[in-house]
């Protein structure tokens, strides 16, 4: 009699490898690893899952879908959770959940498993997303259920023939995708400890970065980055290339104590060279092209959208409504930003746009000025009228 199938979100690490062994007693385990741009050896991960005991092993390249359907939303909405974190991990979880559900439907599985602990945000993101897509799917969290210490987990792995990674003594917990790299644990858990250089993986120390600045040009079409230094690229490829270029200059290092969804504070080290560079450049093109009222209101939407995505609500109607608003604002966001990369900073030093609302003849103080300064007197009188009336009423009341 065949066992029920379970779909396991598989990373290739110790937790999910042990999970295969733990689950296969009661299920036929189908492992699924998604490539969101973390740069792992996918062939190795595929084979390892089968070696440990999975009956099937899927490795799926979703970088392009991740870039266009998820990262682009964060990019166009300048998504920084608590004004610092560009939502690196939070963005990939809805997509991973979506693919897990799709595969479950394809092979007739009724259960999905993940390798999250009981104190992180990701358990919530996976389970809320899966429930939003299919309420009938059961979710198992082996790591949360077994409550083993690291030593007990290693002992179980060795007893059951699960390969123990050679870098297991590495104190850090790292998650990486196209949009950046997140690092926690070890010495980083004490917020008074400066993050050592070994905690960083995709950026050069600003002190060790090149002594000469590098200038790059990023072109946007309706808010979408379409070319880098004149070369037209797919979004995923453009982000990867920017990660290399800006990372070399130490751009995008973020040290942040954040408020987790589960109620605790956590110290995180993020490296987001491509993200920070793109977000900086995009904002400058918006400054040229958005009317004042949209430019002033959009940050309110951006902040709320960042919170919703961080807090596991990608598939909520509120999130989708705010995404629709953001997309509407991007129709005029066309242009090119010139960015100076130098020792940890990404600074826009020039910008141009065919949709620009900047009129040099109105802005200039030279003889080319076309601004009607005589109109200022009447404007000031009407603009200040409510304040004048209020002041007069207050005086008469005394």
UniProtKB/Swiss-Prot annotation:
Coiled coil location: none
Subunit structure: Homotetramer.
Domain of life: Bacteria
Highest classification ranks of the organism: Bacteria, Bacillati, Bacillota, Bacilli, Lactobacillales
Any Gene Ontology CC annotation: cytoplasm
Principal subcellular localisation of the protein: cytoplasm
Keyword presence, Methyltransferase: no
Protein name according to UniProt: Argininosuccinate synthase
Major enzyme class: ligase
Binding site for L-aspartate: 117, 121-122
Pathway: Amino-acid biosynthesis; L-arginine biosynthesis; L-arginine from L-ornithine and carbamoyl phosphate: step 2/3
UniProt-annotated binding residues for ATP: 9-17, 115
Positions of transmembrane segments: none
Keywords, ordered alphabetically: Amino-acid biosynthesis, Arginine biosynthesis, ATP-binding, Cytoplasm, Ligase, Nucleotide-binding
EC nos: 6.3.4.5
Pfam families the record matches: Arginosuc_syn_C, Arginosuc_synth
UniProt record similarity statement: Belongs to the argininosuccinate synthase family. Type 1 subfamily.
């Amino acid at each position: 009699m065949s066992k029920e199938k379970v779909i396991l979100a598989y990373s290739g690490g110790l937790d999910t490898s042990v999970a295969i062994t733990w689950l296969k007693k009661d299920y036929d385990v189908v492992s699924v690893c998604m490539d969101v741009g973390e740069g792992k050896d996918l062939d190795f991960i595929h084979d390892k899952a089968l070696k440990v005991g999975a009956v099937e092993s899927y490795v799926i390249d979703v970088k392009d879908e991740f870039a266009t359907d998820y990262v682009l939303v964060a990019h166009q909405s300048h998504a920084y959770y608590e004004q610092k974190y560009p939502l690196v991990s939070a963005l990939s979880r809805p997509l991973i959940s979506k693919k897990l559900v799709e595969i479950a439907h394809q092979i007739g599985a009724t259960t999905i498993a993940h390798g999250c602990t009981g104190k992180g945000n990701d358990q919530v993101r996976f389970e809320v997303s899966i429930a939003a897509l299919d309420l009938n799917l059961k979710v198992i969290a082996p790591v949360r259920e077994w409550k083993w210490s690291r030593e007990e987990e290693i002992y179980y792995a060795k007893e059951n023939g699960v390969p123990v990674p050679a870098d297991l003594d590495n104190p850090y917990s790292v998650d990486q995708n196209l949009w950046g790299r997140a690092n926690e644990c070890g010495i980083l858990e004490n917020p008074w400890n400066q993050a050592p250089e070994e905690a960083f993986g995709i950026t050069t120390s600003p002190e060790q970065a090149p002594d000469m600045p590098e200038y790059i040009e990023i072109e946007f079409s309706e808010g979408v980055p379409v070319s880098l230094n004149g070369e037209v690229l797919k979004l995923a490829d453009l982000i990867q290339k920017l990660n290399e270029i800006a990372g070399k200059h130490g751009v995008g290092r973020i040290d942040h104590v954040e408020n987790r969804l589960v109620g605790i504070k956590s110290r995180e080290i993020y490296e987001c060279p491509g993200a920070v560079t793109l977000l900086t450049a995009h904002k400058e093109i918006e400054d040229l092209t958005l009317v004042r009222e949209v430019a002033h209101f959009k940050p309110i939407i951006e902040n709320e959208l960042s919170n919703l995505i961080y807090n596991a609500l990608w598939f909520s109607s509120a999130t989708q409504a705010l995404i629709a608003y953001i997309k509407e604002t991007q129709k005029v966001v066309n242009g090119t930003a010139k960015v100076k990369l130098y020792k940890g900073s990404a600074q826009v030093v020039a910008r141009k746009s065919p949709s620009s609302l900047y009129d040099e003849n109105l802005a200039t103080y030279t003889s080319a000025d076309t601004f009607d300064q005589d109109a200022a007197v009447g404007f000031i009188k009407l603009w200040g009228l409510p304040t004048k009336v209020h002041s007069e009423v207050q005086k008469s009341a005394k």
